[in-house]
Structure formats: C-alpha cells, structure tokens
Amino acid sequence: MPAADTVTFWNDVYLSRPAATNPQPNVRLTEIAAHLPAGDALDLGCGNGGDALWLAGQGWRVTATDVSTVAVERLATLAGARGLADRVVAVQCELSSSFPPGKFDLISAQYLHTPLDLDRAPILRSAAQALRPQGRMLVVDHGSVAPWSWNQDPSIRFPSPQEVAEDIGLDSSTWTVERADVSRRVATGPDGSTAEVADHVLIIRRTA
C-alpha cells in the first residue's frame, strides 16, 4: 500500500474515535522502564501517546513517532497541556521508508502490529542500530486473540519472542537478548470488557 494510503487509513482509525484525554501507558513498558535511568527514548507507533507521556513524566526525553498525522498532533497537544512539550517531540513517520535520526537509551515498540502489509524486521533492525551502548529495545507483541482483536481467526499464529529476535538477525557480538518470554495479564478492551491475554516480551540490549 502506498505511504499516502497508509496515512489515510490510520488517520481514519483515529478520527473514528474520540481523542483520548488521559491515555494510559502500556503495562509492560512501565514495569520495565521504571527500573531504568532516564535518558533519550524513542517510541515507535506512539498511538494515543500514553507511553510517551508516561516516559516524559519519569524524566525521559521522548521522540514519539506514528504514521498517523492525527495521532502525533493529538499527542503534541496533550504534551503541551501537561507541561511536557520540552520532553516530547511527536513526529509523523512512515517507518517502512524512513527512520528518526539520533541515538537512544530506550526504544519501545509496543504492539507494533497492523492489518496492512508491513515488514517489521528491517524497522526493528534499524531501531537496534539506533541504540546507544547499554541501551535497550523493548518489543511487546500480542500473543493471543482478545475478544476485541482486529483478527478473530482462532488459527492465527503469533511469532514467539525468540522468532522475532531471529528475524531481526542481530550480531551477537554487539547485541544480546536479555529477555524473551510470554507473560499473561488481564486486559480491558475498548468497550470495558476484560479478558486474559498473552504478551510476547522481547528485550534486546546493545553491548558495544
């Protein structure tokens, strides 16, 4: 799909929903990043901005990207309203064709899924290369189908964290896998219903 069509698709998704006034951060990000010293963070696919705002509130300097111009404009507005405009830079970016410049201590890809065609491996490889030494990339993927999931096909197969790491194909002399596992939690859907879901958690650290 052409980049312009991808932008239009995701803009339509966000415009079909009321703008979030108090977006919440993802659970896996908070439980992991809470133990890291604040530095420069990159949020890939920032969506409503809950992760970027939480990180900024913890002292991080955040570059937050999304393909949707609506999403990044809404995040910039929220950051300004919370007095975090100096800590959050919201950038519209089509990651399949470009990548934000800079080096980062934390790169977060939370549920970077799409119903459109997207080859994630090169994106995550570029992300790993943008880490500073001792920086970490946190990739959290869906590991199960929730009642509110886009795809309700019960036969869908979710790649394991180990398979995602292998697909990225990083040199073990420069990067190491710190964590690759499945964690379960009770999640709340857009309609307020709850269900147990599985998260596939991958943490890659740059060692050199």
Label each PLM-derived region with a short phrase.
Residues 1-36, 145:
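Conserved class I S-adenosyl-L-methionine
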Residues 42, 48-95:
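Class I SAM-dependent methyltransferase SAM/SAH-binding core
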Residues 99-106:
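A short acidic, Gly/Pro-enriched loop at the edge of an enzyme's catalytic core
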Residues 114, 142-147:
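Short "lid" loop at the C-terminus of a central beta-strand within the Rossmann-like core
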Residues 114-127:
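A short, conserved alpha-helix within the catalytic core of class I
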Residues 134-142:
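Conserved beta-strand signature within the Rossmann-like core of class I S-adenosyl-L-methionine
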Residues 157-174, 179-180:
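Short alpha-helix
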Residues 188-208:
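Core SAM-dependent methyltransferase catalytic element
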